[in-house]
Amino acid sequence: MANEREQNHPTIYLFTDGASSGNPGPGGYGIVLKCAGIEKEISGGFSLTTNNRMELMAVIIGLEAIKWKNARVEVYSDSSYVVKALNEDWLATWERRGFTKVKNVDLWTRFIPLYRSHNVTFHWIKGHAGHPENERCDALAVAAGAGAIKNGIALPEDSGYKEEQNKIL
């Protein structure tokens, strides 16, 4: 019965963007969640990270913000990296191969159970093309990353990025 009720929730629209000033550099993510006339914005940043990490982090944080199980979620992202990983089955291949030679494994393994707990569809949208939610997510991401640094706000370390770099060195 509870599962029936959960499936009757309205669709959640998740708009995401990630940014870094330099690649790597200070970076941030921006999220706009919309559902049944309600809108929520989320953002955060790190002192040293990459744009791809922030693009994926935006989706992860957005999915973590959803409290329903089995929610219908439409994700809109300008990240080919994230969208193609799902829509072109890159993620399934990476997982099958044990994530050998794959970057951002810490984030992908955090993403997988979130993705599987909902009914998620990914849509690629062109960035910086006047899409209002994408433009807002971009502004949130830039403000949370490079903008915070410019304003003297100390950002946390992206420990996953640091660990990945230590493996390479």
Positions of PLM-derived features:
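N-terminal hydrophobic targeting segments
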Residues: M1-A2, H128
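RNase H-like nuclease fold core
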Residues: A2-R53, M57, L63-A71, G147-E157, ...
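RNase H catalytic domain
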Residues: T16-P26, I60-R136, L140, G145, ...
